Structure formats: structure tokens, C-alpha cells
């Protein structure tokens, strides 16, 4: 069995994965995902997964061995941020041509490694395998080993050709490369009882820096972050940490489990999205560190910091809650965000009508049920047409998703907030939840949406003509006129007509928007103003009878 095939089989037999553990031996041998034919299009491939997992290491030169399109399509597609070197943003590729494919690209790869060292002198070079050199038999493991000896510098092979499998498999192959070639290869300058690793955190839009000040105040040192704002020397010495927090289990569970197995570093899966989840993660970090020998007063200091930060965050989001209360949100993301962001949205007063679980683990789905109830609407896969219909039918007031589906929301004239890795704002930690609530409020309150929903002038003219003709037809028939009035929908969502609301108010003596929602199909969001007007205009004798 080849080295790549053996590594893939080892990943598929991951004991830390609950889904894998529930399978039979034969099912585990078949693997978690169907391997792809070389060159086939299937969204994010294994190479893309490895690249986005490791590229946030800021001082490393990332060299893609393959055609230039592989590097061009994957460059900077994860909005990570750096506090130091910006070498990671420089695109290096061997740019294989037809001649290289015929005669082999190993010499070209060796030449590229030498050129990078001569010009940039990075502490390490990560070399990524792609489909074409893998198919023609280029041995990047041997080339990297020879280059490391020749230049006395770590040259790490990332053997993750795109046809090996999905983007998620590529994340894990990247983790295996770190375990095999990087982690444990050097010692830290010093250690403390408060050293931790953050695994699967990518510092999107610099959101790690919103959590780091809180950890610094507690005296907790991030020995290594894999891989957001990470440095090569930090990940090489990360085996000396006292505890670890796994931020995105789907991508790096193999790294956390094997570091616990090899170096005795306990880990837990947590999240810094939302107030309650941030607090619980801080408590877990403190508990693990105390169990590993840190002073016991860390627990008390952690609770004091949590109380202060929670009070600040709740006070900051309080002004937004009246405007967000009862608004319905559709969350189209995946992985850890499928449940961690749910908690944050609920804290802001939003109602979740559905969350995507396309890239979520069984543990993620169980957490969603804990937060949203056993009947939670978990969306495994939704086409753009289905998403558009759901938004157009006003089943959600706002959608939070990635850039791929933003145009569906815009076409449906529904507010949209970017929640995926391309986003421009940091939503992690106590300050992050406040920023998320602010962005949601800005999107929902924008006057653009009301203008966008208005019909075009020529459509309005045609509609006016139809209405005039209809009014002329029913002008002489009072019964027909009343029927037409009651059949009118009360707002743009078209969920319920005027007569249904009037009957419900009259028969049941309803006095609030919430009561009307309970007895009818009214959404209560976009319909709220019209329902309030109807309640206020109710005849006084009927109001007194209801009271």
C-alpha cells in the first residue's frame, strides 16, 4: 500500500470520530468518503483542504507543486490575519508545463525550493502535492527529504492531491503532515504551567486577537495556534503544551487525539462564538490546566473575568434586542459554526428556522438538538432553488451564510450577513458577539431592502391598471367588494389574508401580536406593524367585551 493510501486509510479509521466508531470493520475500510477521479470537479478537493488548513502559518513559504491554476484558485481564499510576517500571502508554484508532465517535475520542484530559500530564507517550506504530479509519479517526499539535507532547512511534503478525496480529508492530511514532520522537532524557549494549544483555529479576520487579551489577563499562554497567526517554531514545539482546545473537530480531530496519545496533552472541543460558549470554554481551559499542575487560584480568577466580560457583552447587545426579537434567521454554514453560531444568535433574540449540517459531525448535530430542540430543522443539503423559495416565501427574515449563497438572498431581496471564512468582521469572543449582533441589525434595518422589494415603475403601472379594472368590476357589488377586501394579504410575505386576521381577533378576543401569531399563519415580523394597526382600530365595544 502506498504512503498516501496508508495515510488515508489511517485517517478513515479515526477513533476520535464518533461516526466512524459506530461503523463496522468493513464500513471503516471503505472510508468516509468516495475517492474522486483525477480531474473531476467536486467542490473543495483534498489539496484545497490542506492548503486552507496550513496557509495561515504566517512565516512559512507555501509552495504548490502543480499547474498554476491550482495555486491561483486556492490563493488567499481563507481570510486569516497575521501579526507578523506576510510571507504566507506570497504565492509560490512550480507552474508545471506540458514538458514537465512528459519528463517529470522533480527537478523543477528542487529548483523552486532553492530559489525560495535564496530569495526569502523562510524558517520552513511546505510543499503541496496536486493531482497532475501525483499521477505522473513525482515523489515529493524524496525531493523534500533531499532538499532538507542539502539546504539544512525543514522542507515539509504535504501529500494531498485533489483526487484523494474531499476538502475535509485534505484538512486531516495536512494535520498528519504536521504530526509526522513538524510537531515535536524542537523545544520551546521556556514553558509555563499555563501553556495551551488552540487546534483548528484560523484567526479569520483577526478574531483570535479578540480572545487572546482575555487569556493574557488570566496568565494563559497560547503556546501554539494551529494554524491561525501561527509560526513554524511554535508548532514545532507545541508538544510541550499542558492542555489543548479543539475549535473545529471535523478538520483536526486527528491532530488533537494523536497529540494526547503521544505527548499526554488532554483536549476538549469548545467554541468562542457567543457569550455562554465563550465562558464555558474559558472554564474548561482553566480546569484542564489546574488538573495538569497550574495553581488552583486560576479557577477563581477565571470566574471573575467571565462575570465581568458577560456583564459588558449583555449590556452592549441589549439595545439591539427589541429590534431583533422574533426575527427569523436561516443559518447556511457548516462544521462547528452549525451549532456555535446558533447559540450566539439565540442570545441576540433571533429565532432559528434552520441550520446547515452538511459538514457537521454527529456531535455537532447533538449540540444543535440541545440548543434548538429535538425537532430542529437541520439541512443536510439544499439547492439554490430550494433556498430561494424558502426566502421568497418569507420563512426567514435574514440569512447568514458564505459568499456562494449570497446572491440567492439578494435575488430574494432578503437581508444577508457573511458568516463564513471570507468575512470581513471578527465574531469570536465577547466582543465578537456584539459585532455580530450589530451587523445583523444593520442588515435588517437597512432601507435598501424595502426599496428593493418595490416593483419596477412599469410593473407598478401594469398592476395599477389591473387594480382599476378590478375595482370597476366590483364597484356595483358590495358583497364582492367586501370579499375582495378580506382576501387581501396583510403584507409582502403573503402568509395570511386580512379576513383571517379580523376573524381571529373578533372570535378569540386577541389583544397582542403574539396571540395573533399563535392563532394564524402570520409571521409577526414583517406583518407586525399591520397587525398592531388592526388591533388598535378594533371597535371599542368589542375591545371591552374581550376584556
From Swiss-Prot:
GO terms for biological process: nitrogen fixation; protein-containing complex assembly. Keywords: Nitrogen fixation. Pathway: Cofactor biosynthesis; Fe-Mo cofactor biosynthesis. SUPFAM superfamilies: Helical backbone' metal receptor (SSF53807). InterPro entries: BFD-like_2Fe2S-bd_dom, BFD-like_2Fe2S-bd_dom_sf, Nase/OxRdtase_comp1, Nase_comp1_CS, NifE, NifE-like. GO terms for molecular function: nitrogenase activity. The keyword Oxidoreductase does not apply. The keyword Cytoplasm does not apply. Pfam families: Fer2_BFD, Oxidored_nitro. This protein may play a role in the biosynthesis of the prosthetic group of nitrogenase (FeMo cofactor). Belongs to the NifD/NifK/NifE/NifN family. This is Nitrogenase iron-molybdenum cofactor biosynthesis protein NifE. It comes from Bradyrhizobium diazoefficiens (strain JCM 10833 / BCRC 13528 / IAM 13628 / NBRC 14792 / USDA 110).
